[in-house]
Regions:
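Membrane-interfacial amphipathic/re-entrant helices at transmembrane-helix boundaries
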Residues: 1-22, 49, 60-73, 99-103, ...
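Hydrophobic core segments of alpha-helical transmembrane domains in multi-pass membrane transport
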Residues: 47-53, 77-84, 111-119, 156-165, ...
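Membrane-embedded helix boundary and interhelical linker motif in transport proteins
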Residues: 31-87, 267-275
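Alpha-helical transmembrane segments within multi-pass membrane transporters and channels
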Residues: 61-111, 118, 252-257, 261, ...
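Transmembrane alpha-helical segments in multi-pass inner-membrane proteins
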Residues: 18, 70-78, 202-203, 209, ...
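Transmembrane helix-bundle core of multi-pass membrane transporters
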Residues: 95-96, 101-170, 197, 263-282, ...
Length: 309
């Protein structure tokens, strides 16, 4: 039972990060009908910027509490990451809105490689240690352990997702986003600035990815210029699992995928008689993707996004 609780906690932590990144995928798809496969590398940029801010704080303002340093790293990473994503939309995607679907897809792959190359040039090829700023004393829950960093990650993820729901449901910008997602042409005729809405969508997705990136580094204590590839692909699987285009689906899909992956890692050895180890846990996300696309393409939430191509 303790193993189950431990893996469940691990899954919630992992799933929270997947959910934050999946929201970026699903929001962009909702308003543009486009999959931004470079989004995982936006997470990487957020983590790198966060680490740079922590290094500057250590050099020029030593002695700050760990929570304060993490908060400043996240607050500093968000605007820079938002700017990067806005530039991606403005330079790369805006001209391709009416292009065949293959063009934005190839462009996204090119942007991903470009971001990784820039990160490698600035921060180097080698993995970078991410400082552990919070106490290593674990918190015990039902015989299972969770670190203070992981508790903070869960709290921040909940706050970020709750804030997004309030923005989408209760603000003028949120109503504009829903209108553009429903029918961009009609939204434009109603006086909604669709370009502004699309830019805001990319910015919000980047902010969520920045939070996930900094907390990913804090949780795993190491980051590298290729770190965004696998989490980005898994977050895409989570978005598809939940129902891409649906923000609630992205949240649920991220959490479900994280739990499936963690439970799979914990029990795969027993299930296969020791033939497979926990290092095969990455296969679960893609098995889930194949099953969802085969059995329920609309995802858990079951909302079919209109094909506007």
């Amino acid at each position: 039972m303790e193993t189950f609780i431990q893996q469940l906690l691990n899954g919630l932590v992992l799933g929270s990060m997947y959910a934050l990144v999946a929201l970026g995928y699903t929001m962009v798809y909702g308003v543009l009908n486009l999959i931004n496969f470079a989004h995982g590398d936006v997470l990487m940029i957020g983590a790198m910027i966060g680490l740079t801010i922590l290094q500057l704080l250590e050099a020029y303002v030593p002695g700050l509490p760990g929570y304060v340093q993490l908060a400043l790293a996240i607050l500093g990473a968000i605007p820079i990451t938002m700017l990067v994503n806005i530039l991606i939309e403005r330079i790369a995607y805006r001209r391709l809105r009416n292009a065949p679907r293959l063009a934005p897809l190839i462009t996204a792959i090119g942007i991903s490689i470009l971001l990784q190359t820039f990160a490698m040039m600035i921060w180097g090829r080698s993995p970078l240690p991410f400082p552990q700023l919070l106490s290593s004393e674990p918190i015990m829950i039902g015989g299972a352990m969770i670190s203070q960093t992981q508790v903070l990650l869960l709290v921040l993820a909940a706050l970020a997702m709750g804030s997004l729901v309030l923005l989408v449901e209760r603000t003028r910008m949120g109503r504009a986003m829903r209108a553009v997602a429903e029918n961009p042409r009609v939204a434009g005729l109603m006086g909604i600035d669709t370009n502004r809405v699309i830019v805001a969508t990319f910015a919000i997705g980047a902010a969520l990815a920045a939070v996930a990136g900094v907390m990913w580094g804090a949780n795993y204590a190491s980051i590298t210029f290729t770190m965004g590839v696998l989490p980005g692909l898994k977050a895409f699987c989570a978005a598809v699992l939940g129902g891409i285009g649906n923000i609630y689906g992205a949240m649920i899909g991220g959490l479900v995928l994280g739990i499936i992956e963690a439970l799979g890692a914990g029990y795969i050895g027993d299930l296969t008689g020791g033939f497979l180890g926990s290092h095969y846990q990455d296969i679960f996300a893609f098995v889930v993707l194949i099953l969802v696309l085969t059995l329920r393409p609309s995802g858990i939430m079951g909302e079919r996004v209109a094909d506007r191509a």
